[in-house]
């Protein structure tokens, strides 16, 4: 049975200094990764400094950026922690995509030293006729 969708989870460690707190870098990454993997945007990315509540920083030790871009095929989200230079990326799509393209593109943008990754077939019991 064909899966409903596919998730690729990429955890990036020891990213380039400043990358995990760079709002514009995250925005450009989300905007361009869509084309790299052949997906279709539903809107422009939403990217914010986090964690904040109406502009007030709540947890300085977790300072960073969170972002999301909705896709016709599903969505991509990213979260980062500047104090530890850690960035997480989740790509979810109803269509198959090349995870090596995602990983290499992320490496170019965030210059991580090492990473961990998981690829998951979602909805394997879904009757996708």
Predicted regions and their residues:
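Polybasic/polar functional segments that serve as interface/processing modules
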Residues: 1-129
